[in-house]
Amino acid sequence: MSIKFKTFTQIDGAFDEVIEGSPRIYCTPSGKFPSMTSILAVITDKEDGLAKWRERVGAEEADRITNEAGARGNDLHEYNEKYLLNQLDRSELKGQAKLLFNRVKRYLDEVEATIATEVPLWNADDQYAGRVDAIVMMNQHLTILDQIIQENL
């Protein structure tokens, strides 16, 4: 069975940015701000939970799972972005990321137009910044898309 691909209207509007070091700092027109991911890493106890999980499953298994999840997430991110930019070739789809893409495609098909992908955004008042996967028109509204993948998707 062949999956039908949609063609999206492209609207130009992206801008450049510079990222420095770790933790990630975005250089915005309003100043330098830490990334949202860096802020969340400081205020959550994620490292302790990951260390306990790593100890429970073993270092080798933890590395394997982490590497596979990272590769799958990167592939899916690439598929989603290319799809929104009308650049995805069916032959690129592979493995578990292909299955995930086929599950999220129905939501991407609700997009009316792609404004920009990989867009840096910031809040000068609260002094944080980040990058979203896409800004699109959806249901006649500007909408931010940002991929977050969980194992049970």
Label the model's feature ranges:
Residues 115-153:
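Mg2+/Mn2+-dependent nuclease catalytic core
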Residues 1-129:
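Metal-dependent nuclease catalytic cores that hydrolyze phosphodiester bonds in DNA/RNA
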